[in-house]
A protein has these predicted regions:
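Substrate-binding cleft and catalytic face of glycoside hydrolase catalytic domains
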Residues: 124, 128-144, 157-264
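Active-site beta-loop-alpha junctions enriched in small/polar residues
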Residues: 102-106, 134, 179-181, 222-225, ...
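Substrate-binding cleft/loops of secretory-pathway carbohydrate-active enzymes
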Residues: 114, 263-288, 352
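Short Pro-Gly-centered beta-turn/loop motif in secreted/extracellular proteins
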Residues: 110-125, 429-437
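Bacterial Sec-dependent N-terminal signal peptides
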Residues: 1-37
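Aromatic-rich peripheral "rim/lid" segments of glycoside hydrolase catalytic domains that contact
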Residues: 39-58, 212, 226, 230-233, ...
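Loop/turn elements at helix/coil->beta-strand transitions in domains of secreted/extracellular proteins
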Residues: 95-98, 124-128, 168-173, 215-219, ...
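Beta-strand-rich domain onsets/edges
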Residues: 36-108, 140-141, 147, 175, ...
Length: 464
């Protein structure tokens, strides 16, 4: 993949591409786009020689090779009838890999127009969404959960029902975050200080979520950040294991149950401890389908260190070592929460954010056991108190930032297969494409148009 040239070519066409993706008028969008989309050469120009040394040509070549090896598959199309020699149109219409963001500012972007931009990012740029289910804010008053539209307002905690309905209509994969979170700020204020009483309340809470959403939500972070057992709230005995037992009993088997933990900054020894917690739970019979790991760059100073190439962590070697360690749990990996903050809102700061994001997404996408990546706060100034101001892919006025265009280019251009190709002399057509669903269209020799769909998830032949 030509990292240096592909993004420059996109700049000429980027407005048209965004209009194609998003369901807004061209006029409205063109007025809101940044004047500069920061092509790759400009992003590279703000990154130091030290950064370029860390993310060198050999590293990039290895990432390219691994993406081609692990994210693509060979397809053979076999046609029952004749095919016009003008060729067959092959268009990828969806990805197996999940690219998402949280939905914490749903309906809270200061105008209906901005809210529309926010919501319509799902099903266009992103095919996955993380919806907030923090118990303390979901049920601030015991027995009065805030599920439905019109529930009392809490910042960054929108009522989940309307979001679930939207995502289901648009075939967006949903992750519920999170059922149980042991930190004091996440447990309902009305929770009794009795392990025994908490036990029955936890069980009932999990059962209520399973009953209400059944398979409408495809993935759940059952227990969030269970690694730290020192600074947590009073919790029921063996609560992590028991929560997975209850979730397994109440949710359909089609629903995936996740663990979620901090952070890719950790030394690999700490990642190994997380893996051992997961393996011990699995050994005892817990159903854990996926392992989540967070990747937050919350410090502007850290971003400057990234740009200088002096940071100790989040180097290609460190990232790969941690992903390999996580793989020892023998479960798919989700990069569950990604924050890449800009050092500031200057063109240089935005270019640094875009460049770091490009490299992090590429290496995460290249690992065979990673199944999805979720951007955390989609809008600047939209984070939790104390989190960085410039960590969005949109600014506060919902204008796409350079990092937005980086993600759009990676997901919908570099990592999407579209081609027109004629069958060989045997009537077969061979191609290698990114894993996902495809629309195949062709015309036979009598001029009749045909359309078929295939799901390419591994090497295989398809009879059309």
């Amino acid at each position: 993949m030509m990292r240096g040239n592909s993004f420059k070519a996109v700049n000429i066409k980027v407005v048209g591409l965004v209009v194609t993706c998003l369901v807004f008028s061209p006029t409205a969008l063109s007025e809101r786009l940044y004047a500069q989309t920061t092509p790759t050469d400009k992003m590279d120009a703000v990154m130091s020689a030290g950064y370029q040394k860390v993310w060198n040509k050999e590293v990039q070549a290895r990432i390219d090779r691994d993406i081609r090896t692990y994210r693509m598959a060979d397809a053979t199309l076999q046609f029952a009838g004749s095919v016009n020699r003008k060729g067959v149109r092959i268009e990828q219409v969806s990805h197996d890999f999940l690219f998402g963001s949280n939905t914490f500012l749903w309906g809270d972007c200061h105008s209906p127009h901005n809210d529309s931009i926010y919501s319509n990012t799902f099903g266009t740029l992103f095919n996955a969404a993380t919806i907030a289910f923090y118990w303390r804010d979901l049920e601030p008053t015991k027995g009065q959960p805030r599920f439905a539209a019109g529930s009392p307002y809490i910042h960054r905690r929108p009522a989940p029902d309307p979001i679930v309905a939207f995502m289901n209509r648009h075939n967006v994969n949903i992750n519920g975050h999170c059922i149980i979170y042991g930190q004091p700020f996440a447990i309902p204020a009305w929770m009794p200080d009795s392990r025994l009483q908490m036990d029955s309340l936890f069980k009932a809470h999990i059962q209520e979520l399973a009953s209400r959403y059944t398979d409408k939500i495809q993935r759940w972070d059952v227990v969030n950040e269970c690694y730290d057992q020192v600074n947590r709230h009073l919790m029921p005995d063996d609560y992590t294991f028991r929560c997975y037992q209850w979730a397994n009993a109440f949710f359909p088997k089609s629903v995936s149950l996740n663990m979620n933990e901090c952070d890719m900054h950790w030394p690999t020894t700490d990642i190994n401890h997380y893996v051992e917690i997961a393996r011990n739970l699995l050994f005892r019979g817990a159903r854990i389908n996926n392992l989540g790991i967070q990747s937050h760059i919350m410090s502007t100073d850290e971003m400057e260190q990234m740009a200088e190439g002096t940071i100790r962590y989040l180097t290609p070697e460190h990232i790969w070592a941690n992903l390999q360690a996580l793989s020892k749990a023998e479960r798919p990996i989700y990069i569950s929460e990604v924050t890449v903050c800009a050092p500031d809102s200057t063109p240089r700061g935005l270019a640094i954010q875009a460049a770091v994001t490009r490299d992090l997404y590429r290496i995460y996408f290249s690992h065979p056991n990673v199944r999805g990546i979720t951007w955390w706060n989609m809008v600047d100034h939209g984070g939790f108190k104390g989190e960085p101001l410039y960590s969005g892919i949109y600014d506060v006025d919902m204008r796409p930032k350079p990092v937005y265009h980086v993600l759009d280019t990676l997901i919908h251009q570099e990592w999407t297969t579209r081609l027109t190709q004629a069958p060989d002399k045997n009537g077969e057509l061979h191609f290698r494409g990114f894993k996902g669903r495809y629309r195949i269209t062709w015309t036979d020799k009598k001029g009749h148009r045909h359309e078929s769909f295939i799901h390419l998830d591994k090497d295989g032949a398809f009879q059309l």
